[in-house]
From Swiss-Prot:
It comes from Oreochromis mossambicus. Coiled coil: none annotated. This is the catalytic component of the active enzyme, which catalyzes the hydrolysis of ATP coupled with the exchange of sodium and potassium ions across the plasma membrane. This action creates the electrochemical gradient of sodium and potassium ions, providing the energy for active transport of various nutrients. It is a multi-pass membrane protein. PROSITE patterns: ATPASE_E1_E2 (PS00154). The active site is at 363 (4-aspartylphosphate intermediate). It is found in: Cell membrane. Mg(2+) binds at residues 704, 708. Residues 1-21, 201-221 are annotated as: Disordered. This is Sodium/potassium-transporting ATPase subunit alpha-3. InterPro entries: ATPase_P-typ_cation-transptr_C, ATPase_P-typ_cation-transptr_N, ATPase_P-typ_cyto_dom_N, ATPase_P-typ_P_site, ATPase_P-typ_TM_dom_sf, ATPase_P-typ_transduc_dom_A_sf, Cation_transp_ATPase_P-type, HAD-like_sf.
Length: 1010
């Protein structure tokens, strides 16, 4: 490695090129080189290691063995985003316009009204308070790189100039010769030069749950699958190994994933896009009304300055002050509800994103499966038996008295190094922690359940010699004394890979008797092996032999290094196959996803056969759907002759995936409904997510390993596992499944869809009162009547009576089975659309305005000012110097008296809006169903009705409100003037819904169904 290793892209302006380079497959070639070639490349020695001088030189050249921290976003920037992003912009604009209007009034009037100033202050307070609330709800620093740092080993054992030295992991250099043992964390990417029973846990990197053997031999072209490379930050679980460091820091496979994850840019969440669209609509409506009435005011002879104040007033009146807080609280309530169902949401906007999801890319191990190997089948006496792993052995379906089974159930626990961890007697067997690898743990639990105490069995059959499993032999062997006091022979037991069974066995046990292993039995054996292997199960063979006492007498010294005992002509006893079984709730959850129109794609680092078997087991590949390989096998033709379009399902290997063009990838995603990606790298997982997004899908990704973190970050919503998930995956994700169960995602989808529907209802309810709030201002300008509703009372509606009721709609249950409809189309199905605006502003809002004005005109008429007399009276009404304004009865009114009547009208108009909002709240419970069909089961909504009524009564009758908020007591009869309009709203909307149900897809639905 004479020149600086350039396999890792340098930081430069072409950031996109850097990211594209990172998405490519790992550019490691050292696994294909001989040890001598690797030594030459890195200027090192396989025995002596680097010289101290070379190590110092390489440290200067390459820098420390550490991950480069990404630029982090300061907390104040995050706070500002909450304060000035999305919906807040609309309120800030309103506040600035209010201050501007007040400034104009202050500059042109002797005694300017303070309404605009108060409104500006309140709007500012609303934005700041809601911004703080959102910030603290979502407060999370970008700790992705910090969690990667936690995975970095602190110390490493290196050999320099022939001496073993313990150094800080950051000082490990490319070319260093290092030594690792069981329990160590690998300090860099290393090319293994020697190994003794070494196994590493690559699950965080590749997703494989089984520990992988390491040896000096190249076993695969793919560096992630070969046995002679050990990766930075993975764990050595047993054995020892030596190797030459080939990559450090950012150049390691883990470093590439870290840089890829932290460098990914994520787009806006669907709800953020919807809120932006809503702002555009509201701004458009506000500006249109404002400009229209600005022109009208100029035509009517108002001064330019007055017209500007009117323009600002109308724009501000269109701002729904309470809606930002309502949306935030609704999302928070749903997030809390989801947390109770094991879905912890880190980002409030992610609550709705899950409901919009159209594609779920799910990891296999631990998400769809239980993340624990379990014995699934056994083959003995020439029959396949299903294993019984129930605690009470109620599922047993084979003869446990069979002599062959008794022999198999003796070999399996004796030729096994796994053991239960201490102090777990009260824990059920299936849930006990085991010291040992996954396959041996499965065998241990199976035998403990079926036959009783394994420890007792081992005590009775004392082990005297053992050859541990190694990749070369592919078997494990142990020799035991037998429990029969009258038999002094030693029992040799062996288990291992299938390819090593037949050549070591001369006999097979059938019905408890040894018989020759003839061709017929070999064929039966192969058929059983192929059948179990085809189910994606890991198959192990078991055999035994009672060693002749004359050759191996009591006390014989067995030598396991230079084998001095018989290891062939054994008796084959049976097969046992293991699989990481699907979670019980997953098939039902996948079925619900399918009925909800959500495509579930499996993306795993595991073997294609295993992945396909699990996919079929959980319903990702449904019964009857075939892959091209299945079609080829059925028709007995080569795979190349099968048209890929004929196969609804497909299983794609990572090695094939890397050769696909973007168009080919899009073609697969578009034309196959059921897809499994196997043996995928972290970069490929990311490419799959980007491919789905390119086709317009809203993608959810589930994962638990470091290998999943780039895809989790890029997805529209990343879902990490709370129990088995790495810190890195949890930091990259938007949501965490506390129970690691895929079925919880379906619950989340349901909640997400429900909150979208309920937000629509909340917004429709809130926007409706905008019209009775705006129209008094318009009549004030055009007809020149006294103002019917003041700024203060508008604030009491938006931030007082309306808010609790709007939030109560978040508790509304679904109208129909929302998991039976297709996912929301982000282009067509908007949170706020023209139909919602038409209903809220053009229909229900107009009826509400009529109710408010009816109360207004009745009160003024009772006080002597008939409607005909009010037209054009505004200038005299608001003239402070005029204290003898005459009404229709001939009474003279001072300015103060007139204002008391006006403020009483404001209060009556306010109460009228509350009364008509009762009906609006009830009709907003549903968008299509009749309220009678839905019922009044939402107790929070009923409370909301009482709350807004009680608040209105409090504001009307509480002493001191006339001074504080200019609200005056009303006669009890004045509360009833708006009742007919409230009833009219209810009847009108029920009639609309009846037509919707009777004539689906008709004109009424096209124009009014929001």
């Amino acid at each position: 490695m004479g020149d600086k290793d350039d396999r890792f892209p340098k930081k430069k302006k072409g950031g996109t090129k850097d990211m594209d380079a990172l998405k490519k497959e790992v550019p490691i070639t050292e696994h294909k080189m001989s040890v001598e070639e690797v030594c030459r490349k890195f200027q090192t020695d396989v025995v002596q290691g680097l010289t101290n001088a070379k190590a110092a030189e390489f440290l200067l050249r390459d820098g420390p063995n550490a991950l480069t921290p990404p630029p982090t976003t300061p907390e104040w920037v995050k706070f500002c985003r909450q304060l000035f992003g999305g919906f807040s912009i609309l309120l800030w604009t309103g506040a600035i316009l209010c201050f501007l209007a007040y400034a104009i009034q202050a500059a042109t009037e002797d005694e300017p009204a303070g309404d605009n100033l108060y409104l500006g202050i309140v709007l500012t307070a609303v934005v700041v308070i809601t911004g703080c609330f959102s910030y603290f709800q979502e407060a999370k620093s970008s700790k992705i790189m910090e969690s990667f740092k936690n995975m970095v080993p602190q110390q490493a054992l290196v050999i320099r100039e022939g001496e073993k030295v313990q150094v800080n992991a950051e000082e490990v250099m490319a070319g260093d010769l290092i030594e690792v043992k069981g329990g160590d964390r690998i300090p860099a990417d290393i090319r293994v030069t020697s190994a003794h029973g070494c196994k590493v846990d690559n699950s965080s990197l590749t997703g494989e749950s089984e520990p992988q053997s390491r040896s000096p031999d190249c076993t695969h072209d793919n560096p992630l699958e070969t046995r002679n490379i050990a990766f930075f930050s993975t764990n050595c679980v047993e054995g020892t190994a030596r190797g030459i460091v080939i990559c450090t820091g950012d150049r390691t496979v883990m470093g590439r994933i870290a840089t890829l994850t932290s460098g990914l840019e994520t787009g806006k969440t669907p709800i953020a896009v919807e809120i932006e669209h809503f702002i555009h609509i509201i701004t458009g409506v506000a500006v249109f009304l404002g400009v229209t009435f600005f022109i009208l005011a100029i035509i009517l002879g108002y001064t330019w300055l007055k017209a500007v104040i009117f323009l600002i007033g109308i724009i501000v009146a269109n701002v729904p002050e309470g809606l930002l807080a309502t949306v935030t609280v609704c999302l928070t309530l749903t997030a809390k509800r989801m947390a109770k169902k094991n879905c912890l949401v880190k980002n409030l906007e992610a609550v709705e994103t899950l409901g919009s999801t159209s594609t779920i890319c799910s990891d296999k191990t631990g998400t769809l499966t239980q993340n624990r190997m379990t014995v699934a089948h056994m083959w003995f006496d020439n029959q396949i038996h299903e294993a019984d792993t129930t605690e009470d052995q109620s599922g047993a379906a084979f003869d446990k008295s069979s002599v062959t089974w008794l022999s198999l159930s003796r070999v399996a626990p004796l030729c096994n190094r796994a053991q239960f961890k201490p102090r777990q007697d009260s824990v059920s067997i299936l849930k006990r922690d085991v010291a040992g690898d996954a396959s041996e743990s499965a065998l241990l639990k199976c035998i403990e359940l079926s036959c009783g105490s394994v420890r007792m069995m081992r005590d009775k059959n004392k082990k005297v010699a053992e050859i541990p499993f190694n990749p070369t032999n592919k078997y494990q062997l142990s020799i035991h004394e037998t429990e029969d006091p009258n038999d002094n022979r030693y029992l040799l037991v062996m288990k291992g890979a299938l390819e090593r069974i037949l050549d070591r066995c001369s006999t097979i046990m059938l019905q408890g008797k040894e018989q020759p292993m003839d061709e017929e039995m070999k064929e039966a054996f192969q058929n059983a092996y192929m059948e179990l292997g085809g189910l994606g199960e890991r198959v192990l063979g078991f055999r035994h032999l009672l060693l002749p006492e004359d050759q191996y007498p009591k006390g014989f010294a067995f030598d396991t290094d230079d084998v001095n005992f018989q290891t062939d002509n054994l008796c084959f006893v049976g097969l046992m196959s293991m699989i990481d079984p699907p979670r019980a709730a997953v098939p039902d959850a996948v079925g619900k996803c399918r009925s909800a129109g959500i495509k579930v794609i499996m993306v795993t680092g595991d073997h294609p056969i295993t992945a396909k078997a699990i996919a079929k087991g959980v319903g990702i590949i449904s019964e009857g759907n075939e892959t091209v390989e299945d079609i080829a096998a059925r028709l007995n033709i080569p795979v190349s002759q099968v048209n890929p379009r004929d196969a609804k399902a497909c299983v794609i290997h990572g090695s094939d995936l890397k050769d696909l063009s973007q168009d080919q990838m899009d073609d697969i995603l578009r034309n196959h409904t059921e897809i499994v990606f196997a043996r995928t790298s972290p970069q490929q997982k990311l490419i799959i997510v980007e491919g789905c997004q390119r086709l317009g899908a809203i993608v959810a990704v589930t994962g638990d390993g470091v290998n999943d973190s780039p895809a989790l970050k890029k997805a529209d919503i990343g879902v990490a596992m709370g129990i088995s998930g790495s810190d890195v995956s949890k930091q990259a994700a938007d949501m965490i499944l506390l129970d690691d169960n895929f079925a919880s995602i379906v619950t989340g989808v349901e909640e997400g869809r429900l909150i979208f529907d309920n937000l629509k209802k909340s917004i429709a309810y809130t926007l409706t009162s905008n019209i009775p709030e705006i129209t008094p201002f318009l009549f004030f300008i055009i007809v020149n009547i006294p103002l019917a509703l003041g700024t203060i009372t508008i604030l009491c509606i938006d931030l007082g009576t309306d808010m609790g009721s709007a939030i109560s709609l978040a508790y509304e249950t679904a109208e129909s089975d929302i998991m039976k409809r297709q996912p929301r189309n982000p282009c067509r199905d908007k949170l706020v659309n023209e139909r919602l605006i038409s209903i809220a502003y053009g229909q229900i809002g107009m009826i509400q305005a009529l109710g408010g004005f009816f109360s207004y005109f009745v009160i003024l008429a009772e006080n002597g000012f008939l409607p005909s007399q009010l037209v054009g009276i505004r200038l005299n009404w608001d003239d402070r110097s005029l204290n003898d304004l005459e009404d229709s009865y001939g009474q003279q009114w001072t300015y103060e008296q007139r204002k008391i009547v006006e403020f009483t009208c404001h209060t009556a108009f306010f109460v009228s809006i509350v009364v008509v909002q009762w009906a609006d709240l009830i009709i907003c419970k549903t968008r299509r169903n009749s309220v009678f069909q839905q019922g009044m089961k939402n107790k929070i909504l009923i409370f909301g009705l009482f709350e807004e009524t009680a608040l209105a009564a409090f504001l009307s009758y509480c002493p001191g409100m006339d001074v504080a908020l200019r609200m005056y007591p009303l006669k009890p009869t004045w509360w009833f003037w708006a009742f007919p309009y409230s009833f009219l709203i209810f009847v009108y909307d029920e009639a609309r819904k009846l037509i919707l149900c009777r004539n689906p897809g008709g004109w009424v639905e096209k124009e009014t169904y929001y």
